[in-house]
C-alpha cells in the first residue's frame, strides 16, 4: 500500500555480518535520501568518543622511578612497556577500579596471561605481549591499576591534579577507555519498489574484544536516542525561580544585648530601661541613653564602639519593630 508522501520510511532490514568475534558489518536499509550520512556520522562519533570501557591508568614497576628509564634484563624500555599496557583489553564486572599484579622471571615473553586477577576481571587477549625478558635471572614485577571510564583521557590531563598525592614510581598511562578500535561507514544506493533514491547504511567496526560489535551499535543508538529525547517535546520545562524570602530584619538585631559583651555596669543600665535586644538599643539616641540612671559618657562610648564594630550605630530607625517573634515573648 502506498504511504503518504509526507511519511518517512523507517529501516526495516538490519543485517549483521559477523566477520570475527571483534569485527562485524551492520547494514541498515532503506533510509530516506540523506539519512544514511546523518545517522552514520552520528553513530560513528558516538562509537569513537562516548562508549564506556576499562583501561590501564597507572602502573608501578619494581625498581623503576620514571618512564624514561630502562630495566636490566628487559628488552623493551619503560615507555614501550607502558605503550603495550595501554593496549591491554580488560573486562571488569561490578567495579569501577581494580588492581592487577604481574610477576614473571626467566627468559621469554611476558604476556597478559601472566597477570594475576580475581574473578571479576577477564583478560580478553591473554596472548597480548607486554615485554620480553632476556636473561635467566631477569624478573619483572608490577602493579597495574585498571579503571572504568569513557573516551580517551591522556595522562597529561591528570598529572597536575594528582601531583601532590602521587608517589614517586607510580607511572601514569594514557587511558583509552573506548572498546571500539576502528569504525567506518559507507552509504550505498537502495531501492524500494519504484523508488531508487534511497540510502543503505553499512557500518563496519572492530572492537578490542571487551564488547560485541552488535552490542556496541545498540549502546550507541541508545545514547543517541536519549540525547534526542529533549527535542521531542520542546515545552519549557524549566522550573520557576523561587525567590528567597529576605528576612524583615538583620539577624543581628534580633540577638540579645548580652551578645555585645558589654561591661556589667552598662549591661545592667540597659536592662533597667527594658532594652533587651540589639534592635531595641540601636533605636535609642545618645541623649536618651545619657538620661539613663548610672549610665555615663564612658559607658556611652563603650556602647557606640561595640555597635560600630558590628556595622551599627545609635539613632537608627526600624520600621515595624519589634517583630512578631519578639513581641509575643
Curated annotation (Swiss-Prot):
* Span list, region Required for interaction with Crp at class II promoters: 162-165
State any GO BP term from the record.
bacterial-type flagellum assembly
**KW Disulfide bond (keyword) present:** no
- List the Gene Ontology MF annotations in alphabetical order: DNA binding; DNA-directed RNA polymerase activity; protein dimerization activity
What's its EC? 2.7.7.6
Any single Pfam family the record assigns to this protein: RNA_pol_A_bac
- Where is the stretch described as Alpha N-terminal domain (alpha-NTD)? 1-235
The Gene Ontology CC terms held by the record are:
cytoplasm; cytosol; cytosolic DNA-directed RNA polymerase complex; membrane; transcription elongation factor complex
N6-acetyllysine PTM sites in chain numbering:
297-298
- Chemical reaction(s) catalysed: RNA(n) + a ribonucleoside 5'-triphosphate = RNA(n+1) + diphosphate
Q: Which residues carry this modification: ADP-ribosylarginine?
A: 265
**Annotated Gene3D superfamilies:** 5' to 3' exonuclease, C-terminal subdomain, DNA-directed RNA polymerase, insert domain, RNA polymerase, RBP11-like subunit
Q: How is it modified after translation?
A: Acetylated on Lys-297 and Lys-298 in the presence of glucose. PatZ controls acetylation of Lys-298 but not of Lys-297. (Microbial infection) ADP-ribosylated on both alpha subunits by the phage T4 protein ModA. ADP-ribosylated on only one of the alpha subunits by the phage T4 protein Alt.
Task: Look up the domain of life of the source.
Answer: Bacteria
Q: Where is this region: Alpha C-terminal domain (alpha-CTD)?
A: 249-329
Subunit: Homodimer. The RNAP catalytic core consists of 2 alpha, 1 beta, 1 beta' and 1 omega subunit. When a sigma factor is associated with the core the holoenzyme is formed, which can initiate transcription. Both the N- and C-terminus interact with different regions of transcriptional regulator CRP. The rRNA transcription and antitermination complex (rrnTAC) consists of RNAP, NusA, NusB, NusE (rpsJ), NusG, SubB, ribosomal protein S4, DNA and precursor rRNA; S4 is more flexible than other subunits.
Q: Which family does it belong to?
A: Belongs to the RNA polymerase alpha chain family.
Task: Write down what this protein is called.
Answer: DNA-directed RNA polymerase subunit alpha
User: What species is given as this protein's source?
Assistant: Escherichia coli (strain K12)
Q: What is the lineage of its organism?
A: Bacteria, Pseudomonadati, Pseudomonadota, Gammaproteobacteria, Enterobacterales
| The gene coding this protein | rpoA
Amino acid at each position: 500500500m502506498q504511504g503518504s508522501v509526507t511519511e518517512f520510511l523507517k529501516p526495516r532490514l538490519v543485517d549483521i555480518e559477523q566477520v570475527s568475534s571483534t569485527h562485524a558489518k551492520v547494514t541498515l536499509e532503506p533510509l530516506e535520501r540523506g539519512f544514511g550520512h546523518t545517522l552514520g556520522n552520528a553513530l560513528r562519533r558516538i562509537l569513537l568518543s562516548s562508549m564506556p570501557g576499562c583501561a590501564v591508568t597507572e602502573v608501578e614497576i619494581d625498581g623503576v622511578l620514571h618512564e624514561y628509564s630502562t630495566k636490566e634484563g628487559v628488552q623493551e624500555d619503560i615507555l614501550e612497556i607502558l605503550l603495550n599496557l595501554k593496549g591491554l583489553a580488560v573486562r571488569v564486572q561490578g567495579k569501577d577500579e581494580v588492581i592487577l599484579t604481574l610477576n614473571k622471571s626467566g627468559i621469554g615473553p611476558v604476556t597478559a596471561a601472566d597477570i594475576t586477577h580475581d574473578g571479576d576481571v577477564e583478560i580478553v587477549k591473554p596472548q597480548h605481549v607486554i615485554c620480553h625478558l632476556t636473561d635467566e635471572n631477569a624478573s619483572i614485577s608490577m602493579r597495574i591499576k585498571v579503571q572504568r571510564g569513557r573516551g580517551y583521557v591522556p595522562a597529561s590531563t591528570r598529572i597536575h591534579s594528582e601531583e601532590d598525592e602521587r608517589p614517586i614510581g607510580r607511572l601514569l598511562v594514557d587511558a583509552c577507555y573506548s572498546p571500539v578500535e576502528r569504525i567506518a561507514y559507507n552509504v550505498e544506493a537502495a531501492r524500494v519498489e519504484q523508488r531508487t533514491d534511497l540510502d543503505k547504511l553499512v557500518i563496519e567496526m572492530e572492537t578490542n574484544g571487551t564488547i560485541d560489535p552488535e552490542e556496541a551499535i545498540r549502546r550507541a543508538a541508545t545514547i543517541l536516542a536519549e540525547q534526542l529525547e529533549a527535542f521531542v517535546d520542546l515545552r519549557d520545562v524549566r522550573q520557576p525561580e523561587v525567590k528567597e524570602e529576605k528576612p524583615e530584619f538583620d539577624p543581628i538585631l534580633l540577638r540579645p544585648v548580652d551578645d555585645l559583651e558589654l561591661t556589667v555596669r552598662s549591661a545592667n543600665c540597659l536592662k533597667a530601661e527594658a532594652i533587651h535586644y540589639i534592635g531595641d538599643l540601636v533605636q535609642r539616641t545618645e541623649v536618651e541613653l545619657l538620661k539613663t540612671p548610672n549610665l555615663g559618657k564612658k559607658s556611652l562610648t563603650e556602647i557606640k564602639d561595640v555597635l560600630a564594630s558590628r556595622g551599627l550605630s545609635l539613632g537608627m530607625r526600624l520600621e515595624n519593630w519589634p517583630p512578631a517573634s519578639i513581641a509575643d515573648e
